[in-house]
């Protein structure tokens, strides 16, 4: 049986096992285009609907249990029931839901982030997308320039989408694209557009682009070339700040001018932030007596009703202050590297063109023989085989992204990870024997 024929069979089996999810999907499509409001959740024949979650386990509306190896695309690092976060959020919300003013927790979280990640200043947003938009605005105002350099395969939010080139629905910035993990090619693009470049924005590892880590030399040469022409370096660490004590960029031996954050720091609540050098972030200083306005200088306005919302800010304080400390982050990165090696060991036992890429606790399966180093390698994979692996893992109680992404969480037990490896082994064996 060909992979394409096997996919049709697997989809029918999936539909037969999940009638309640199908019913929910059909009803939801009456009111929401596509049946949901998050495009990445789409897969054939229809996405699962979940009823509950506890620890690292999800339960769908048909009653099936899954080991959650997706972790909400890195936002669910803590699992589904971290009481050290939830108890503090509940207590804060009992006191006040929306103060309409400043509150002590936001200064606490700002201090925790600056000390943890080695940044001078930070401001909060509602998402990583907003954080990246504000980081770009910061760079444009600081330089007086308008052009942005991004990378083919990069993703910085729903309106900063470059996974398959610049999406036509993107925010209307003047963007030039450079090849990821190609230092010489990037240097040429920067040299060509240098006089008009406000910023270079880059992920230390392509997230939506397939968990493809950057080469350290590529990052260093890109940053040096950007600074040589006066452009601001923006590192999108919305996903990768989870790695090591200060984020993946630090482990690569580089430092950006502005860094964006999000995902797990909100403890499951919406969160984003952008921070970095004081001279850049102080463009937002509205202090009446000592700020930029008092000196007759331009001040950037940064509004947002929920930028400092009580739930997200309180959760962030608990996440960085108690749960995901620097020591825990360092150990978790090591555990992720070890688990990815185990995954590679399982793959090596089967005669299928499948590999794994990633860094620390983030990784992705690819239906191709050679590990991709850029988005072209990711795009070259066998889509039918990719889907068979995804559906096969679901059938065996393991929830991943349809595109192959897997993220290790704090709630995963060694027993659960062993069961994941067994499920992957059994899935690949079944595919190879079709």
Residue ranges and their predicted role:
Residues 324-326, 392-434:
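PLP-dependent enzyme catalytic core of the Aspartate aminotransferase-like
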Residues 3-52:
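Active-site-adjacent loop/helix segments that line or gate small-molecule/cofactor pockets in enzymes
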Residues 254-290, 308-313:
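Active-site PLP attachment segment
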Residues 203-216, 230-252, 258:
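Conserved PLP phosphate-binding loop immediately N-terminal to the Schiff-base lysine helix
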Residues 65-142:
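Glycine-rich loop-to-alpha-helix module at the N-terminal edge of alpha/beta enzyme cores
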Residues 108-202, 206, 217, 337-340:
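PLP-dependent aspartate aminotransferase-fold enzymes
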Residues 336-340, 350-388:
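Conserved PLP-binding catalytic core of the aspartate aminotransferase-like
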Residues 13, 319-344, 376-383:
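Structural signature of PLP-dependent enzymes
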């Amino acid at each position: 049986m060909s992979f394409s024929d096997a996919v049709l069979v697997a989809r029918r089996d999936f539909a037969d096992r999940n009638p309640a999810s199908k019913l929910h999907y059909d009803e939801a499509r009456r009111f929401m285009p596509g049946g949901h409001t998050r495009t990445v959740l789409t897969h054939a024949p229809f996405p699962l609907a979940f009823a509950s979650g506890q620890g690292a386990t999800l339960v769908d509306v048909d009653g099936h249990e899954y080991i959650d190896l997706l972790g909400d695309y890195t936002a669910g690092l803590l699992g589904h029931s971290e009481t050290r976060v939830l108890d503090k959020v509940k207590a804060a919300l009992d006191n006040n839901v929306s103060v309409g003013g400043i509150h002590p927790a936001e200064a606490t979280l700002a201090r925790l982030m600056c000390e943890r990640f080695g940044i001078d200043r930070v401001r909060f947003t509602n998402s990583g997308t907003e954080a990246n938009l504000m980081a770009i605005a910061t760079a444009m105002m600081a330089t007086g320039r308008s052009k942005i350099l991004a990378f083919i395969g990069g993703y910085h939010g729903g309106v900063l989408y470059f996974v398959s080139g610049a999406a036509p629905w993107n925010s209307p910035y003047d963007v030039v694209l450079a090849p990821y993990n190609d230092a010489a090619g990037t240097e040429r693009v920067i040299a060509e557009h240098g006089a008009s470049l406000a910023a270079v924005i880059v992920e230390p590892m392509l997230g939506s682009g397939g968990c493809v880590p950057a080469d350290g030399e590529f990052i260093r040469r890109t940053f040096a070339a950007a600074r040589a022409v006066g452009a601001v370096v923006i590192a999108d660490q919305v996903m990768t700040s989870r790695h090591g004590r200060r984020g993946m960029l630090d482990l690569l031996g580089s430092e950006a001018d502005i860094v964006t954050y999000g995902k797990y720091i909100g403890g499951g609540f919406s969160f984003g932030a952008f921070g970095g050098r004081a001279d850049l972030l102080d463009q937002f200083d509205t202090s009446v007596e000592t700020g930029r306005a008092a000196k007759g200088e331009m001040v950037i306005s940064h509004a947002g009703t929920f930028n400092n919302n009580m739930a997200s800010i309180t959760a962030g304080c608990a996440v960085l202050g108690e749960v995901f400390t620097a020591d825990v982050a360092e150990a978790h990165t090591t555990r992720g590297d070890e688990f990815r090696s185990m995954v590679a060991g399982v793959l090596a036992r089967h005669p299928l063109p499948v590999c794994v890429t990633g860094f620390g606790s983030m990784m992705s399966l690819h239906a191709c023989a050679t590990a991709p180093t850029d988005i072209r390698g990711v795009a070259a994979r066998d889509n039918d085989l990719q889907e068979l692996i995804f559906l096969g893992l679901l059938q065996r109680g393991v929830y991943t992204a349809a595109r192959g992404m897997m993220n290790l969480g704090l709630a995963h037990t060694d027993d659960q990870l062993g069961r994941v490896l067994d499920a992957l082994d059994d899935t690949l064996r079944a595919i190879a024997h079709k």
